[in-house]
Swiss-Prot record:
Name of the protein this chain belongs to: Cystatin-S
Species per Swiss-Prot/TrEMBL record: Rattus norvegicus (Rat)
Gene3D superfamilies to which the protein is assigned, alphabetical: 3.10.450.10
PANTHER family recorded: CYSTATIN (PTHR46186), CYSTATIN-C (PTHR46186:SF6)
GO molecular function, one term: cysteine-type endopeptidase inhibitor activity
Site location (Reactive site): 32
Span(s) of short sequence motif Secondary area of contact: 76-80
Amino acid sequence: MAYLLHAQLFLLTTFILVLNMRLCPVLGHFLGGIEKSSMEEEGASEALNYAVNEYNEKNSDLYLSRVVEVKDVQKQVVAGTKFFFDVILGKTICLKTQGDLTNCPLNEEADQQEHEFCSFVVHDIPWENYIVLLSSSCHSI
């Protein structure tokens, strides 16, 4: 008799677990797996700004680039958060020596409108005040 009770409890527990995973997709994700995110995610905006600043520092262009469009954002919860960004960057009229992108308009001249599709991976550990650009790749579009 005790065996039947244990079997019924096991089946009921399994049923509830499966039901929870179907109704709550977050439980269905693998721990540490890459999942869809958005720019509203805590830390995403800062991570993308960091990636663009690093991009501007390291490229050989005279002018700053800034984000024209965010195509995709994904995240992976590790020790901190890894953000995966796919964005379109556009050249601005601001020289790198100006350094501030806040009031920097895009170059609107037809022959100067250069855009790049870029993928950035940023690892952010806010409680350690640590952020690093792990990878970046860009190509003209």
